[in-house]
Amino acid sequence: MRIEEEIKLDYSDVLFRPKRSTLKSRKEVDLIRKYQFRHSKLIWQGIPIIASNMDGVGEIEVAKKLASYKLLTALTKQHEIKDIKNIASIKKFNNSIALSSGTSRVSYERLNKIIAKYPHFQFICIDV
């Protein structure tokens, strides 16, 4: 016999709990949400899922595809300004993309250059 001593979690230990639904089918589910940010008063509407700013995930082609489904992408911080120029010209993507920056002075200056050139991007991801 093996005795398991580690903590076991159940529904009383989680923040999200299932609740009764009046929906007849999963097709009726609407994932789109509308948020108003407390300090900027910016309103964003979409599906609140963000693709990470990891290599291979936070790429421009991924951002374009996910934006068509109203999902967000945090671009990797390695993108050059010329790469961002290609997506900045497509206005429908601007509220679906977060520009990424590290915490170094160089990263901060790079982010400021991008924002100065393309001020219509609304979101920033700070990679620590």
Where in this protein do the model-derived segments appear?
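Active-site entrance/lid segments in N-terminal catalytic domains of soluble metabolic enzymes
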Residues: M1-V128
